[in-house]
């Protein structure tokens, strides 16, 4: 019997052993440099340092062999040719670029890094780089009292990770996770430090099991790995936006997804028959509830064999997919890595024949138990296997499918360790490595194979890929959902910091299973969660077999009406959200942001985890406890306008706000703008109108960027997009708008403006021309239709 709280589920506790003796790197004796690489010869090995940009520096040390400057699959950036000066004294060597200074203490060897304003970023004190004879490597850094730590990818708990210890080892948590569960499905050995209003970051490029220890009572923190080298990058910032731009320049940014992927997704483990899928789709249509995607979980397959479908359950799958697509609904099937051992199964036959499966060093194939039973696992570290796997997705594209859901790709195995034997050997494109070293990138490389295969097969259309497992850089290929949560209020609460920290780790396209995967939800919880989901980047309702259904109508008309309202609101907000996705594609900035991201000088924002920003100027303060209609919310500097009532709240302070079950508290910063579109049943329906809502201030200037393209192809990469810069100058009784556009895309919609907090006498000009406006005295809005 499941309890009513997930506190009953406790993470596994490892036996605590005495700390292994660590050997310090020792003293530096000599140094040299060639072609932008600086080498420092120390007692126990060579440290190599290279500037990747003026504001990114890489430091590598391998105590067990040659220090290599090769990279993991996470890194896509080639180092720039950065001019750096060198200065040596008796005690130190100093390397200086235009934006960073690296000071190397000689005895013992210790690293300090400053920005170009002399701000200390990271420093080593009593301890520095060290290792053990068992193969562990570790790096200690000084921890300031003012330090706050964010990122680390997919982690439960609070937003600020100071005081926590986290492990990176992709793990399928059989019992749905709770706020103390660690590790989870993804590994992102990266974090951002915010200190006194400024930010910097560190990426530890090591694919072994890694640990980040901020739980220490001392003034040092540590990051370590079970094997490999110390190899990390320091990002100089100085703002959180700068750090994320630097990190995603190194590890890559997400491609723009198809617009349909931003719509509402409905899923269940499982919709088990063609008839059930048709009934679900038809109910959405009859109830006029927008929908873009229905998922097929594992029951669509023939005996859980990937690249098959059960012809008894789905006798006309191709026709089903075509019929739904005509109605604006796409089908996304699940694809796991496990390939059933079956001599008559063509995928298994091909894998055996071409030596595509993971093997032991002796040459025998590794088998593990997963949903199909005894199964082999493709070795995605081999480019031939990735190509083969990608090509196999023609099975799906021939059916009309444009999106894939990768699951069980940690890889998950039904055994005591929950995964593949760490002694398995991966080909690694001719440089064999153990699974112990490459475990954390298995799901990443499956994602690469899937995305690239689908992209090629779709002939210019954008594919959509959803993944459970991943590593730093996974944003290049996939959206991420946070795995098997539960239908508890605490899991709704937990989803906010999880998604915000994923966004701070470069994964802008993410979201939880709305409503909770396991356990039985209720109408109030589902409603409050759907309100939040309408503003998370990825919006999917998903629940497990054996538990209460969670479709929008599952709890009766009272809740259905409210849920429908917020799904429709999601579609109305898609122009604004799509603009933010374009920003994420271009700069790495998250769609869903913690408040400190925009207000790093405001220490009141550092620990806020129960409210978030959508972009820079929209604040969401959801209700996330039962039978609650009021909450306290913090508002940063500026004035904030209640989206529903128009009430203006002064920022820089806390406010008690009211929100009945029908209301999600949404606030727009005065002086900013948002672009809204038509309410429609699917993203397949074109917008006829686009309205830029300007929230008038009494003075000052602001710029809003509106982005659009065809939403389906990659033509935006060749300039076929619209980026409209809308510059607004506010007077006490005037609003002057200047527009400037770039790109070749010609949208079908007509542009309008709505000036909030205006009067009938407010003068409005657009590009120098005075406008005739319609005034709504009740809402105090001036409406202007642009020609």
Curated annotation (Swiss-Prot):
Active site: 407, 410, 484 (proton donor)
GO biological process: carbohydrate metabolic process
Keyword Cell inner membrane among UniProt keywords: no
Keywords, ordered alphabetically: Glycosidase, Hydrolase
GO molecular function terms attached to this record: alpha-1,4-glucosidase activity; carbohydrate binding
Domain of life: Bacteria
Xref: Pfam families: DUF5110 (PF17137), Gal_mutarotas_2 (PF13802), Glyco_hydro_31_2nd (PF01055), Glyco_hydro_31_3rd (PF21365)
EC number(s) stated in the UniProt entry for this protein: 3.2.1.20
Statement: the UniProt record of this protein carries the keyword Glycoprotein: no
Catalytic activity reported: Hydrolysis of terminal, non-reducing (1->4)-linked alpha-D-glucose residues with release of alpha-D-glucose
First-level EC class: hydrolase
CDD domains tied to this protein: GH31_glucosidase_II_MalA, GH31_N
Family, as annotated: Belongs to the glycosyl hydrolase 31 family.
Subunit structure, interactors included: Homohexamer.
Identification of the protein by name: Alpha-glucosidase 2
Lineage, top ranks: Bacteria, Bacillati, Bacillota, Bacilli, Bacillales
